[in-house]
């Protein structure tokens, strides 16, 4: 946009289209530029992305608002520190520190959710159909299941395999698998199974080196579990994996594979594996070597008050040997858990999904191709209805200091420095004046309080002519 005050002309170029408007500009002292909704003429406006607002005068750059880092609704320009105010903004940079809800649903029917990491697609599997949610655009497709059944109709027992492009419904206690071909719209299992799961809230992860899914622990029928299972892609059988020494039974721990080892963090349970005994959180990181079958405690934290009810998976960050995991603390919060030290830190703002639930599918997913992390919270309430919410957060992750805009000290106006100097100088004079007044008052009081008589002398002056 170019303002020609001399010729009363505004030239606007938008989307490679030029527009010229004749407006009385001579004598104008202030100009307000609004991007988005106009408070004077329109009530609705389509959302738009804005960045890099620049103002030039006679070819010189006098203002530049990047609209990236900010302080609440205020953004400072890079030239003079001038303020730009946004009304009800949605800052894209905040998507790197805050979870954004991309889907919500309440339903009374049975539901399970799986994720396709390659295409960022969610599969919401119901009894006779599958809804496919695009995690990027938010678009929804539907397919009708023509025949067959999943092996488990409860939450937390569904995965998507990107190698075969199939949905896997699995039952750990029955060691059965049913495959859904999206193209053929058919489950491979011909008989319906209605058994309740024995392994609610188990940890799960995928091992690319042997193309297998691994599942650990869980809860069901008043017992905590510590069994380890494997499902190799392309087979229809789940097999148990032996290891020793045994890890204490638990549920709601997070799992990831690094090299030959399966790592487990957090969870809740007890050594006996029975609900009648007191349960507690496990503030520890354990590992199972999948080649040797040997388990170990990597580290254990003695005291903590954090809630270590974790999403079923976590993801390894090799740059600093840490894991990204999600805790139920504060209704959902992303943590960085360090492999070589008993430390975890919060790296996102909490979601605060504090709805009370009876059961929950709490699943954490990563889509590296789209540079996004996703979280599924499927809360089953006491009336057995589902309250489903799906959240996303962008990577790389940022912290508050990286999105907060700090005013450049070099941009402070000169008059402000003069004003500060005058205030300081005036304060110094006032301070000295008070000290002198204090001394004079003290001398006067000393004279008045003395008992020595005061003599008065009279002088007569004469002037000789």
Locate the predicted segments by residue.
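Extracellular glycan-interaction surfaces
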Residues: 1-24
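Extracytoplasmic low-complexity segments
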Residues: 58-102
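Beta-propeller blade signature
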Residues: 177-183, 226-236, 277-293, 332-343, ...
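Short, conserved, GDST-rich strand-edge loop motifs in beta-rich repeat architectures
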Residues: 215-220, 266-281, 380-388
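Repeated scaffold domains used in trafficking and secretory/extracellular systems
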Residues: 105-115, 150-160, 197-205, 248-256, ...
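Blade-level signature of beta-propeller repeat domains, shared across WD40, Kelch, NHL, RCC1
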Residues: 358-419
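Conserved blade-ending motifs and adjacent loop-strand segments that build the rim/top face
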Residues: 247-249, 297-312, 341-368, 405-410
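Flexible glycan-contacting loops in extracellular carbohydrate-active proteins
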Residues: 20-51
């Amino acid at each position: 946009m170019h303002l020609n005050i001399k010729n009363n002309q505004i030239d606007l170029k938008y989307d490679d289209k030029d527009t010229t408007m004749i407006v009385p500009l001579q004598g104008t002292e202030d100009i307000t530029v609004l991007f988005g909704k106009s408070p004077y003429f329109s009530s609705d406006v389509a959302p738009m992305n804005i960045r890099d607002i620049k103002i030039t005068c006679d070819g010189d750059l006098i203002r530049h608002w990047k609209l990236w880092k900010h302080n609440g609704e205020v953004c400072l320009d890079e030239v003079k520190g001038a303020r730009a105010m946004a009304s009800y903004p949605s800052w894209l940079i905040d998507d790197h520190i805050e979870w954004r809800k991309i889907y919500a649903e309440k339903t009374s029917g049975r539901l399970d959710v799986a994720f396709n990491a390659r295409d960022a697609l969610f599969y919401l599997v119901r009894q006779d159909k599958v809804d496919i949610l695009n995690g990027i655009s938010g678009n929804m497709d539907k397919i009708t299941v023509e025949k067959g059944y999943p092996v488990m109709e409860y939450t937390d027992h569904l995965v998507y395999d990107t190698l075969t492009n199939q949905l896997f419904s699995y039952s750990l206690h029955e060691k059965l698998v049913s495959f859904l071909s999206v193209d053929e719209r058919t489950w491979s299992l011909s008989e319906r199974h209605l058994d309740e799961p024995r392994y609610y809230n188990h940890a799960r992860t995928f091992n690319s080196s042997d193309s297998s899914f691994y599942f650990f622990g869980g809860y069901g029928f008043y017992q905590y579990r510590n069994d380890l299972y494997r499902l190799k892609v392309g087979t229809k059988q789940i097999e148990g994996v032996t290891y020793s020494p045994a890890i204490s039974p638990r549920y709601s721990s997070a799992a990831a594979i690094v090299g030959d080892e399966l790592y487990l963090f957090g969870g809740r349970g007890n050594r006996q594996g029975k609900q009648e005994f007191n349960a507690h959180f496990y503030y520890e990181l354990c590992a199972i070597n999948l080649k040797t079958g040997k388990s170990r405690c990597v580290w254990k934290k003695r005291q903590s008050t954090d809630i270590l009810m974790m999403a079923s998976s976590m993801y390894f960050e090799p740059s600093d040997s840490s894991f990204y995991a999600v805790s139920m603390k504060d209704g959902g919060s992303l943590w960085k858990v360090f492999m070589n030290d008993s430390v975890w830190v919060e790296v996102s703002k909490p979601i605060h999904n504090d709805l009370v639930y009876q059961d929950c599918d709490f699943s954490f997913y990563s889509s590296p191709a789209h540079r996004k992390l996703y979280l599924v919270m499927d809360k089953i309430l006491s009336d057995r209805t589902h309250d489903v919410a799906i959240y996303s957060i962008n990577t790389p992750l940022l912290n508050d200091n990286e999105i907060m805009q700090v005013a450049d000290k070099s941009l402070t106006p000169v008059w402000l420095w003069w004003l500060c100097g005058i205030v300081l100088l005036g304060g110094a004079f006032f301070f000295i004046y008070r000290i002198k007044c204090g001394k004079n008052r003290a001398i006067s009081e000393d004279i008045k309080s003395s008992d020595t008589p005061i003599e008065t002398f009279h002088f007569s002056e004469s002037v000789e002519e």
